[in-house]
């Protein structure tokens, strides 16, 4: 069966990898819609190659510029309404949500209402509104298929298994760019240092989140919703080689793991063609060449953001959305070299501490908490500077 796919975030790291997968298997995958933020040069190339029915960009000006360069066969939209139009296009049956940040939340929700299966790479959607998204998926008979390598690994390990027989999920982490640095050494490190990820090629925001281990915290929160497992049963393990993507330990002591080369095209292809597999020409894993694998506990004193994520996830309500929003603000300013690395964790902590949590929040309450946290975090950092 041919999958008709819309990609939210087609010019980012996940989006371009996804289009590589589509190019490799044109008999199985067709592109219906694409969205970009500001990179219309790359989007224009993608439009010419994949001939989508609809695309969306960030602003009306960018949409007008794009119209001058492409044929009238592709509808061009913009803004949040444009994202939603792509996500809900009637010709698609699978939506890859790979935009960065909480901007992926509304289009994902609308896609579920339109009964689309979701290949989910946008962590923040489940972090901020996991209870809403998972319930909508159930109500509409939609599948949430994970794309992150860690969640794809768990998803594959649990195929055919009974959730009641799970003892724990073990999410692996490379440790990020600063894994071998001391707290003292990290004080003066800048964005250019954090962007040198040891194993994966990722977007800038995600690479900074990896350096703070906030990314791993988000993945723990995501796993809680994807697999309906309490936080007490989700562990993190540092695995520097990024060969074992995650593990599941069962109540009888058996441990199942999924291994593969660190190439995002593999979990993307698995998600796109689920429930069956396709052959690929990507690098195959050779354990004899690797020789040995290493594991250690994460240092929560060195990387407190991981602990914050656990705590906020357990609190629930609007607190996870606040955690995410404060992180987005601080991350963006660190990327501009306007704040120090440790200001990220300080901003997150202070913003979460100041928040008045709303239990079992509506979507509106989550969005209000998100906006409040952005304003509060910005004010904290303005005062600091």
Swiss-Prot record:
Keywords: Isoprene biosynthesis, Manganese, Metal-binding, NADP, Oxidoreductase. It comes from the Bacteria. Belongs to the DXR family. The gene is dxr1. Mn(2+) binds at residues 148, 150, 219. Its cofactor is Mg(2+); Mn(2+). GO terms for biological process: isopentenyl diphosphate biosynthetic process, methylerythritol 4-phosphate pathway involved in terpenoid biosynthetic process. This is 1-deoxy-D-xylulose 5-phosphate reductoisomerase 1. 1-deoxy-D-xylulose 5-phosphate binds at residues 123, 149-150, 174, 197, 210, 215-216, 219. Catalyzes the NADPH-dependent rearrangement and reduction of 1-deoxy-D-xylulose-5-phosphate (DXP) to 2-C-methyl-D-erythritol 4-phosphate (MEP). InterPro entries: DXP_reductoisomerase, DXP_reductoisomerase_C, DXP_reductoisomerase_N, DXPR_C, DXPR_C_sf, NAD(P)-bd_dom_sf. NADPH binds at residues 11-14, 39, 122, 124, 203. Pathway: Isoprenoid biosynthesis; isopentenyl diphosphate biosynthesis via DXP pathway; isopentenyl diphosphate from 1-deoxy-D-xylulose 5-phosphate: step 1/6. It comes from Bacillus cereus (strain ZK / E33L). The keyword Lipid metabolism does not apply. It is an enzyme of class 1 (oxidoreductase). One of its GO terms (molecular function) is NADPH binding. The keyword Ion transport does not apply. Signal peptide: none annotated. Its EC number is 1.1.1.267. PANTHER family: 1-DEOXY-D-XYLULOSE 5-PHOSPHATE REDUCTOISOMERASE, 1-DEOXY-D-XYLULOSE 5-PHOSPHATE REDUCTOISOMERASE, CHLOROPLASTIC. It catalyses: 2-C-methyl-D-erythritol 4-phosphate + NADP(+) = 1-deoxy-D-xylulose 5-phosphate + NADPH + H(+).
